[in-house]
Amino acid sequence: MKIGIIGAMAQEVEILLGYMAEPKLTEIAGCKIYEGKINNTDIALLQSGIGKTAAAMGTALLLQLTKPEMVINTGSAGGLDANLNVGDIVISTEVRHHDIDVTAFGYEKGQLPANPAAFMANEQLAQIAIKETEKAGFNAVSGLICSGDLFVNGNDMIARIRNDFPSVKAVEMEAASIAQVCHAFQVPFVVVRAISDVADKESHLSFDEFLPLAAEKSSEIVLAMLNNFA
């Protein structure tokens, strides 16, 4: 079994890379794909770059070149749920785009033509993530994660997203595109991210300060998940 793991930034993949035995690097179109073993499991680890286009391009390359049987998206996110604080874990049950609007043609907010409104995470993977988060003693929330090509920072932006997607738990900039590509390739996925900032007007300051903590927490859960497939 081979598992694909995707993070946008170097900080979000470097801890996992440190556990990989003799990684083989492929660089293509700005993406870095590391192949090797972690805990005796074959892993293809992608550093995609930031944003939905980079994530989609990288995910397609990962799936086409390395053929993983499942995908875990790791990294950081901004918390929109009242029960989430910096360092907590958010696990996807579904993922949607929050910056797409073709409702004039009868689609739901965030839905693209020829695609579902929500990309559903694999239930088994989500349950494994929840189990390992509980074992680690971390606070976690599962539910809707929304993605857009903007850093959510400010009350007006937060109000719009909450109005359009009342059940949203967290926001970030890649997961919906990763999920969309996985949907097209029929590869199961889950998003497991740690909260680096609680989305408000100071979230950009919190993100810079707490990104290392978020990377550490999310990587710990992903590593624990891998033990279920060894």
From Swiss-Prot:
Amino-acid biosynthesis recorded as keyword: yes
Keyword Hydrolase: yes
GO CC annotation, single: cytosol
Pathway as given in its UniProt record: Amino-acid biosynthesis; L-methionine biosynthesis via salvage pathway; S-methyl-5-thio-alpha-D-ribose 1-phosphate from S-methyl-5'-thioadenosine (hydrolase route): step 1/2
Record's signal peptide: none
Biological role: Catalyzes the irreversible cleavage of the glycosidic bond in both 5'-methylthioadenosine (MTA) and S-adenosylhomocysteine (SAH/AdoHcy) to adenine and the corresponding thioribose, 5'-methylthioribose and S-ribosylhomocysteine, respectively. Also cleaves 5'-deoxyadenosine, a toxic by-product of radical S-adenosylmethionine (SAM) enzymes, into 5-deoxyribose and adenine.
Name assigned to this protein: 5'-methylthioadenosine/S-adenosylhomocysteine nucleosidase
